[in-house]
């Protein structure tokens, strides 16, 4: 039986984000800049990561509190060995209606069929440019956009529902918006443009680098005949639009200009097994991994997860201003640990 719970702001819990690794094969400046995450950077050892059995146990308990959707994140989740086994186990859980994966897409041809066979159907691919030179400058690994586009085509061909996520930075890749809308208009792929956020401690964020939803929409409207689309469900983070001629849709995610804290229903488990109630958390999360490994029962997990959600009052993006960002003294948790 599912117990319906809410946090201090009346928000239910519906989504669980599981970060399966802190490692990534890209070095994008806004997430894992190469100057910090260099060849000598020490990532988490294997025994500090949650095991698949631990993740499944956590997810099973969360379904009793109302979780219906699970998203696998990282780091780059396709670097975690035997990920298809985790997908298969999660798919067996009663109450789980949807499992998704967020990836940079580089390893989709290598692992995609196994993941599909395990029951995964939805993939979000992070692709911040369609121009090879622009994309290579962002990922700092000399990986071409055309390589990722081929991986996306492969994923679509074997049956995945694919969305493309684009983090837009002023003066970096805002010139990619129109060509990317054009490219994906006639593909069976939905593209979403995300306002640049101040996630983690190392991405050099400030307001001047943000391209707002209104600015993005103006660029698109100058080149395409579009119309808005009604939200599909409570807590949907993207504002969707469709082309009038072929009804192909794209989304704009207003993470800075019009925050969606009031409808956020996501719990997060970091790659080292800690609970976070917000992508912008500054307080080190409750250590679920240690709690479990010290002998916690399923009922104790249930009560702990319930208590953590009941006291949740995070609304960072609602409160963000240039001054609050400048004055922030406590470090945020980096995105490769907490998951995007």
UniProtKB/Swiss-Prot annotation:
Q: Which reaction does it catalyse?
A: GTP + AH2 + S-adenosyl-L-methionine = (8S)-3',8-cyclo-7,8-dihydroguanosine 5'-triphosphate + 5'-deoxyadenosine + L-methionine + A + H(+)
Q: Which cofactor does it need?
A: [4Fe-4S] cluster
Chain segments annotated as coiled-coil in the UniProt record:
none
Q: What is its EC number?
A: 4.1.99.22
The alphabetized list of GO BP terms reads: Mo-molybdopterin cofactor biosynthetic process
Identify the residues that the record assigns to the Radical SAM core domain, covering every copy: 8-227
Cofactor descriptive note: Binds 2 [4Fe-4S] clusters. Binds 1 [4Fe-4S] cluster coordinated with 3 cysteines and an exchangeable S-adenosyl-L-methionine and 1 [4Fe-4S] cluster coordinated with 3 cysteines and the GTP-derived substrate.
Recorded superkingdom: Bacteria
This protein's UniProt keywords: 4Fe-4S, GTP-binding, Iron, Iron-sulfur, Lyase, Metal-binding, Molybdenum cofactor biosynthesis, Nucleotide-binding, S-adenosyl-L-methionine
Pathway it belongs to?
Cofactor biosynthesis; molybdopterin biosynthesis
The protein's role, per its UniProt record: Catalyzes the cyclization of GTP to (8S)-3',8-cyclo-7,8-dihydroguanosine 5'-triphosphate.
- Family listed: Belongs to the radical SAM superfamily. MoaA family.
InterPro entries in alphabetical order? Aldolase_TIM, Elp3/MiaA/NifB-like_rSAM, MoaA, MoaA_NifB_PqqE_Fe-S-bd_CS, MoaA_twitch, MoCo_biosynth_MoaA/MoaC, rSAM
Task: Give me the residues that bind GTP, please.
Answer: 17, 71, 102, 163, 266-268
A GO molecular function assigned to this protein is: cyclic pyranopterin monophosphate synthase activity
Positions bound to [4Fe-4S] cluster 2: 261, 264, 278
Self-association and partners: Monomer and homodimer.
What is one Pfam family matched by this protein?
Radical_SAM
Name of the protein in its database record? GTP 3',8-cyclase
Q: Per UniProt, where does [4Fe-4S] cluster 1 bind?
A: 24, 28, 31
Q: Can you tell me which residues bind S-adenosyl-L-methionine?
A: 30, 75, 126, 197
């Amino acid at each position: 039986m599912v117990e319906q719970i809410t946090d201090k702001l009346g928000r239910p819990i519906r989504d669980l984000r599981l970060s399966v690794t802190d490692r990534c094969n890209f070095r994008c400046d806004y997430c894992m800049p190469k100057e910090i995450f260099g060849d000598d950077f020490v990532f988490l050892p294997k025994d500090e990561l949650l095991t698949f059995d631990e993740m499944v146990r956590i997810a099973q308990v969360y379904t009793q509190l109302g979780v219906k959707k699970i998203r696998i994140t990282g780091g780059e989740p396709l670097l975690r060995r035997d990920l298809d086994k985790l997908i298969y186990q999660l798919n067996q859980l009663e109450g789980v209606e949807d499992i998704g994966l967020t990836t940079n897409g580089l390893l989709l041809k290598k692992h995609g069929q196994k993941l599909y066979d395990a029951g995964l159907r939805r993939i979000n691919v992070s692709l911040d440019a369609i121009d090879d030179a622009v994309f290579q400058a962002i990922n700092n690994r000399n990986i071409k956009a055309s390589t990722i586009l081929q991986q996306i085509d492969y994923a679509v061909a074997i049956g995945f529902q694919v969305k493309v996520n684009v983090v837009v930075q002023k003066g970096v890749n805002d010139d990619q918006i129109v060509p990317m809308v054009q490219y994906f208009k006639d593909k069976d792929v939905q593209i979403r443009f995300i306002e640049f956020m101040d996630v983690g401690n190392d991405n050099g964020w400030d307001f001047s680098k943000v391209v707002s939803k209104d600015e993005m929409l103006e660029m698109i409207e100058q080149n395409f005949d579009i119309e808005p689309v009604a939200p599909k469900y409570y807590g949907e983070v993207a504002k969707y639009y469709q082309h009038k001629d072929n009804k192909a849709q794209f989304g704009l995610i207003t993470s800075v200009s019009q925050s969606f804290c009031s409808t956020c229903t996501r719990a997060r488990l970091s790659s080292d097994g800690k609970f976070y109630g917000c992508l912008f958390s500054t307080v080190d999360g409750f250590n679920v991994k240690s709690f479990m490994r010290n002998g916690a029962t399923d009922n104790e997990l249930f009560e702990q997860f319930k208590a953590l959600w009941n006291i949740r009052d995070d609304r960072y993006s609602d409160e963000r201003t240039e001054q609050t960002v400048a004055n922030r003294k406590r470090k945020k948790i980096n995105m490769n640990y907490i998951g995007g």
